[in-house]
Amino acid sequence: MKKKRFNSDIEVQAFARHICMSAHKMRRVIDQIRGRSYEQTLMILELMPYRASYPIFRLIYSAAANASKTMGSKEADSLISKAEVNEGTFIKKLKPRARGRSYPIKKPTCHIIIVLKDKSKKPKSFLERKYGFVDKYMIGK
């Protein structure tokens, strides 16, 4: 499996793992916010009546705080470039029943990945990321 490239100059990731909710219910909310701006996303999530919106709200708020801390960018300039929900493990419990028997209960969990992109910054070239600068002799004419 190939690893996807991550441009740390203009993007910030945030992960939430083992959230006790099915991935299908989370995707219903995530599909509404993918590709929107940070401020618009927070307004949408506050007004949604679903239980899944609160963990996503907290995660996006955390990702914006990471962006302002690491890159020094404004939260208003952020855009949700990637929002992904994957299935996690099942929490397994036993429910006691009649005559000393027990029934298994499987509660699904999910993992969320949010990537915020800064609209105001431009991505750096390969040479700028590798050497920290670009000289006119490096480019070649």
From Swiss-Prot:
Record key words, sorted: Chloroplast, Plastid, Ribonucleoprotein, Ribosomal protein, RNA-binding, rRNA-binding
- Any GO molecular function: rRNA binding
Q: Which CDD domains match?
A: Ribosomal_L22 (cd00336)
Q: Check the record and name the InterPro entries matching this protein.
A: Ribosomal_uL22, Ribosomal_uL22_bac/chlpt-type, Ribosomal_uL22_bac/org-type, Ribosomal_uL22_CS, Ribosomal_uL22_sf
- The answer to keyword Glycosyltransferase applying to this record is no
Q: Where in the cell is it found?
A: Plastid, Chloroplast
Span-the-membrane segments of this chain are none
Pfam families assigned to the protein according to its UniProt record, in alphabetical order:
Ribosomal_L22
The GO cellular component terms are: chloroplast; large ribosomal subunit
User: A biological process (GO) annotation for this entry?
Assistant: translation
**Is the Iron-sulfur keyword given for this protein?**
no
Q: Which PANTHER family match?
A: CHLOROPLAST 50S RIBOSOMAL PROTEIN L22-RELATED (PTHR13501), LARGE RIBOSOMAL SUBUNIT PROTEIN UL22M (PTHR13501:SF10)
This protein's assembly is summarised as: Part of the 50S ribosomal subunit.
- In which family does this protein belong, per the annotation? Belongs to the universal ribosomal protein uL22 family.
Cited function: This protein binds specifically to 23S rRNA.
Can you name this protein? Large ribosomal subunit protein uL22c
Organism, by scientific name, is Chloranthus spicatus (Chulantree)
Q: What is the lineage of its organism?
A: Eukaryota, Viridiplantae, Streptophyta, Embryophyta, Tracheophyta
